[in-house]
């Protein structure tokens, strides 16, 4: 919590939060307290599956057979106060939505979806297109499933920001992630890559399941991204 709060000292122009703020029925106040210094800056957010459902024990080997599944035995979390707390500070809720976002004198057209990991995404239902007059077309999603990345790329997104993968959580030195808990290639589990015509950045995030509270060769992270204008004179 203290480390997350200390990130405000970086004075970012804006904050993009890609979900999984919670994992416990009593986690809302702690999450909002940790985010409070960052909420002094403009922000947008989406939710992840752990904001809707409490985690349960799972055999880690299960992840090698494909993405984990949400079962009826996982209790629902009271996520509405979390959303209310962030929007009260002026952050934009990107749950299957598009917003035009003024940041540091620039216009960013942003489209986000609810978490594809639990099939709450509805990109086709976002009736507003990216603003053609914007300086940047930005897509935001928690779990970087290919169906959403494909839709955003086809919609002319220039940059997509995602989370969910924990960077693989357990990485093999010299090789990288073994799993992503979605259908994204493990080689793209962390950091900057490309998907079709747009840049993709997947954050390894800060935490992990309380039932698997460890990482290996994959430290928690928050990423400070600097965007620069593309020169029309580049050869």
Segments from the language model and where they lie:
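Short, Asp-centered acidic motifs that coordinate Mg2+ and/or phosphate
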Residues: 13-14, 44-45, 108, 136-138, ...
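Conserved beta-sheet core of the metallophosphoesterase superfamily
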Residues: 144-223
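Active-site metal-binding loops of divalent metal-dependent hydrolases
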Residues: 19-21, 49-52, 97-98, 113-116, ...
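Short beta-strand-to-coil "C-cap" segments at the C-terminal boundary of structured domains/repeats
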Residues: 225-232
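Short acidic-hydrophobic surface loop/beta-edge motif
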Residues: 97-104, 189-195
């Amino acid at each position: 919590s203290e480390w997350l709060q200390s990130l405000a000292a970086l004075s970012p122009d804006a904050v993009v939060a890609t979900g999984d703020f919670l994992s416990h029925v009593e986690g809302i106040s702690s999450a909002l307290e940790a985010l409070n210094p960052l909420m002094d800056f403009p922000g947008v957010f989406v939710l992840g599956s752990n904001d809707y459902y409490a985690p349960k024990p799972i055999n880690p080997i299960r992840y090698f057979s494909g993405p984990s599944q949400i079962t009826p035995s996982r209790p629902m979390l009271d996520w509405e106060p979390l959303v209310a707390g962030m929007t009260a500070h002026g952050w934009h809720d990107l749950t299957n939505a598009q917003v035009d976002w003024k940041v540091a004198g620039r216009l960013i057209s942003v489209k986000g979806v609810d978490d594809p990991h639990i099939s709450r995404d509805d990109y086709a239902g976002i009736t507003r297109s990216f603003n053609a007059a914007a300086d940047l077309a930005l897509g935001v999603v928690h779990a970087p499933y290919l169906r959403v990345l494909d839709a955003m790329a086809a919609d002319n997104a220039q940059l997509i920001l995602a989370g969910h993968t924990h960077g693989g959580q357990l990485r093999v030195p010299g090789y990288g992630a073994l799993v992503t808990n979605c259908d994204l290639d493990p080689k793209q589990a962390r950091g900057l890559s490309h998907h079709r015509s747009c840049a993709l950045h997947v954050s390894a995030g800060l935490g992990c399941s309380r039932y698997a509270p460890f990482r290996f060769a994959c430290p928690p992270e928050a990423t400070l991204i600097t965007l620069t204008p593309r020169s029309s004179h580049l050869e």
